[in-house]
């Protein structure tokens, strides 16, 4: 088995090794070394990337026999090569993974829930728990987790003997029996884990919950740690500052100011809908019963009002009642209704005539078209014909 240098020193950034094997693997090459600093994918954490000799390391996987590095160029078996991991990426992941251990340990000790899923993604960290917690409860955990960071307690890794392991209490999703690597965050968590971690909690930096949702009878939470949490804070602070300036209110008053705007918008929409309803009544007064079709091209701001107009107009038309809104330049949206024709069957003919797309029920279809207004009116003036 490949010697795991990342187990010995999680902060080491480069190393030298001997190439034991290099096999073509599609467009990549599978390289096995006598020792490696590259962490293979496992435990919810993606593999390290970086450079190895003159090749880029694209992925790393572990098998029962060896750790396999997938590179974009071949390496010569027997050669000594220098490798370097993508350190900023590794450190970010160590911050996140160690932060997850603290949170999971606290959730278990405070509320008795177990971590049943973990994924360290490119932009966020996702954890699943086998029970529900409220947002205030998660904020309590967040406060305790950040207190752990401020205390700067050590994080230790070890491979205890089977005898000692049998006497230990630790978290684990799997039933492990040998070569169990235990990660201990002193006073907060003891967990079986194969991944690199920071050396002390102070290296983690800020820990922040960003969301929670119900998931498979429990909850799924997302967090950010360290550098990622700082970036997120800067971006959100900039957004709040911009909103504060646009609304001419203090940053602490942005939420109530936005709520006032939303209330005003709701009132304006209600008033506009009432005006549209009155306008529909006036439109209908101009219509007369006809054995042919009715076609109106007008401004309909409310889709509900547009449908109401068609519902009323189709009672007067022996053919169809067609309502269009839009412009020749940007195209039109339409709703067409009929009490005498099967519009689902007629949709193909209608759309072909007005360069449209759409469909619906036998009594009503809706869609869009690009034909100009004159062509639309000319078609419906003669539709459906005899």
Residue ranges, per PLM feature:
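A glycine- and charged-residue-rich anion-binding loop/surface
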Residues: 1-386
């Amino acid at each position: 088995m490949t010697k795991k240098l990342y187990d010995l020193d999680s902060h080491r950034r480069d190393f030298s090794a001997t190439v034991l094997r290099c096999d073509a693997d599609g467009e990549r090459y599978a390289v096995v070394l006598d020792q490696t600093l590259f962490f293979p994918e496992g435990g919810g954490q993606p593999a390290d990337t970086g450079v190895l000799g003159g090749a880029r390391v694209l992925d790393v996987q572990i098998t029962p026999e060896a750790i396999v590095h997938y590179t974009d160029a071949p390496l010569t078996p027997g050669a000594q090569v220098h490798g370097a991991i993508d350190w900023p990426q590794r450190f970010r992941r160590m911050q996140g993974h160690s932060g997850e251990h603290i949170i999971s340990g606290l959730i278990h000790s405070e509320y008795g829930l177990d971590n049943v899923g973990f994924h360290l993604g490119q932009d966020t960290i996702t954890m699943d728990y086998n029970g529900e917690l409220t947002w205030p409860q998660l904020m309590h955990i967040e406060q305790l987790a950040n207190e752990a960071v401020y205390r700067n307690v050590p994080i230790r890794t070890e491979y205890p003997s089977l005898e000692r392991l049998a006497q230990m209490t630790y978290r684990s999703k799997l039933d492990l029996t040998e070569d169990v690597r235990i990660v201990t965050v002193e006073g907060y968590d003891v967990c079986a884990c194969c991944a690199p971690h920071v050396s002390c909690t102070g290296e983690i930096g800020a820990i922040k919950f960003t969301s929670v949702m119900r998931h498979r009878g429990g909850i799924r939470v997302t967090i950010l740690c360290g550098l990622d949490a700082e970036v997120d804070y800067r971006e959100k602070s900039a957004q709040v500052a911009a909103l504060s300036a646009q609304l001419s209110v203090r940053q602490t008053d942005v939420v109530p100011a936005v709520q006032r705007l939303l209330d005003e918008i709701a009132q304006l929409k209600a008033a506009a809908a009432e005006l549209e309803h009155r306008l529909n009544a006036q439109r209908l007064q101009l219509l007369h019963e006809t054995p042919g079709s009715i076609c109106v091209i007008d401004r309909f701001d409310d889709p509900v009002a547009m449908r109401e107009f068609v519902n009323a107009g189709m009672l007067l038309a022996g053919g169809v009642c067609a309502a269009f809104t839009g412009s020749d330049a940007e195209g039109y949206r339409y709703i067409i209704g009929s009490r005498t024709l099967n519009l689902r069957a007629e949709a193909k003919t209608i759309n072909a005539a007005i360069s449209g797309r759409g469909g619906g029920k036998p009594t009503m279809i809706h869609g869009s078209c690009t034909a100009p207004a004159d062509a639309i009116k000319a078609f419906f003036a003669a539709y459906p014909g005899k």
